[in-house]
């Protein structure tokens, strides 16, 4: 099945949205850093915890996760800090 959108694996990281995990206090300098990045093609990359298995049995009726997709959870502070950097339409 052809999907109307596909992730482009050759897109490069352009800029961080919001503050770094260190600035927000959501990391202890380990490699576990939640983050949101705009890619050079306009898409966004989210670094967070993969909770696909934990949520699989309790998705809302109109939500589905394809085999190549994951449910990624980030701290609220990460998204709130990015709000002013998210481009408008």
For every predicted segment, state its role.
Residues 26-29, 53-57:
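Short amphipathic alpha-helical surface micro-motifs
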Residues 48, 55-89:
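Helix-rich interaction surfaces within compact, conserved domain-sized segments
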Residues 44, 52:
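Surface-exposed, flexible loop/turn segments at secondary-structure boundaries
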Residues 32, 46:
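Short, surface-exposed polybasic-aromatic patches that bind anionic ligands, especially phosphate groups
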Residues 1-31:
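Short, charged/polar N-terminal "headpieces" of proteins
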Residues 35:
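Short, surface-exposed charged micro-motifs
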Residues 18, 47-48:
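Glycine-centered structural positions embedded in regular secondary structure
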